[in-house]
Amino acid sequence: DHIGSVRDTLPGRDGYALSGITLVGSLIHFDKLVDRGWPDYDFPSREKVLAADKGFIEHYFRFIEHQRSLGMVAEKFENGSRKQFAMKYDPKPYARDFEIRNLASNGEMWTGKGMKTRKMYSGDINLFDENMNSCAIRLRYGKFSYYNGGDLSGGNLDMPSYPSKERDFESQIAGVCG
């Protein structure tokens, strides 16, 4: 769920170190990169974003800019969208059966109606950690459905480090995910 680590980098030749996504992106061309923070990276604040991956985030930003110069498109993850991750080849025969729905990111989730979203927590900074930023999607193909929510909080709410049910994002998302 992390973009890379400054401790585990290989030297790169395009102005950024290679680790995590920058390493994979140097080996496999991405047509599109979808990121929860693009282009501002200001949730919950720019300072918190820069501190979260200290030493590596700058390499990630340079990677994005370099890849964009080669034709990659960068987009912000759109909560509620079912078009951001569309089938590229021959989509018509699968239009009714295939969908990737963006469910949540940045502590905000799709309501299940149109493109409407709502906050999943009150904004209490004491409850916040980077896991609450995770992007969640549901892939549906016919009767098959798959959910991925990265590191979204949920589960054992009796732990002292998680004193609030407000941190249980997964249960909230389950209602619209199905």
State each model region's role:
Residues 3-168:
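Flexible, acidic/histidine-containing loops and adjacent segments that form or flank the divalent-metal
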